[in-house]
C-alpha cells in the first residue's frame, strides 16, 4: 500500500503545518514547523496507544493550542468522530485526544469542526441524514458548555 497525504491544515501565519498521512487503512496526524525558510521534520502528534485510528481533517484554533480533528477508533460513537486535544506548552506535546461527544458527534461520520473565535461562528461537516456520498455543513454559534462523550448514556 502506498502512503498518501490525506488532509492538511496550515495556520494563518504559515509556520505550523498539521497533516494526516497514511494509507487506505490507517492514518495519523503529524506536525512540522517552519523556521526561516525550512520546515522541520514531521513528528507524530499522538501515540498509537491513544485509541485514535484513521485521523484526518485537522483544524488548529487561532489560540495555537486547541486542535480538533476527525478520527475513528475505540473511543468513537460510530464512523468518524470529532476529537479535541490541547498543546502542553511546557512539554511541547499534545495531550491525549478526547472525543468531544454530543451534539457534535453522532453514529454517522462527523468530519470537521472549525470555530472562528473572532466572529463567534462554528462549522460542522457531517454526513448524518445525508444521501450516500454527500455531506452537510452546519453553521452554529459556539457556547462554553458541552456534553462529554464519557458522560453520555447512549443506551
Describe the predicted segments one by one.
Residues 1-155:
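Short, conserved micro-motifs composed of acidic
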Amino acid at each position: 500500500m502506498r502512503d498518501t497525504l490525506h488532509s492538511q491544515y496550515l495556520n494563518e501565519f504559515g509556520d505550523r503545518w498539521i497533516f494526516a498521512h497514511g494509507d487506505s487503512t490507517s492514518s495519523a496526524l503529524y506536525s512540522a514547523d517552519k523556521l526561516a525558510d525550512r520546515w522541520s521534520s514531521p513528528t507524530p502528534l499522538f501515540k498509537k496507544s491513544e485509541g485514535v485510528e484513521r485521523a484526518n481533517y485537522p483544524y488548529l484554533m487561532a489560540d495555537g493550542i486547541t486542535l480538533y480533528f476527525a478520527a475513528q477508533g475505540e473511543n468513537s460513537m460510530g464512523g468518524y468522530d470529532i476529537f479535541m486535544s490541547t498543546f502542553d506548552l511546557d512539554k511541547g506535546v499534545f495531550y491525549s485526544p478526547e472525543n468531544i461527544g454530543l451534539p457534535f458527534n453522532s453514529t454517522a461520520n462527523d468530519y470537521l469542526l472549525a470555530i472562528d473565535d473572532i466572529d463567534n461562528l462554528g462549522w460542522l461537516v457531517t454526513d448524518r441524514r445525508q444521501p450516500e456520498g454527500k455531506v452537510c455543513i452546519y453553521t452554529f454559534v459556539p457556547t462554553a458548555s458541552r456534553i462529554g462523550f464519557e458522560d453520555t448514556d447512549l443506551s
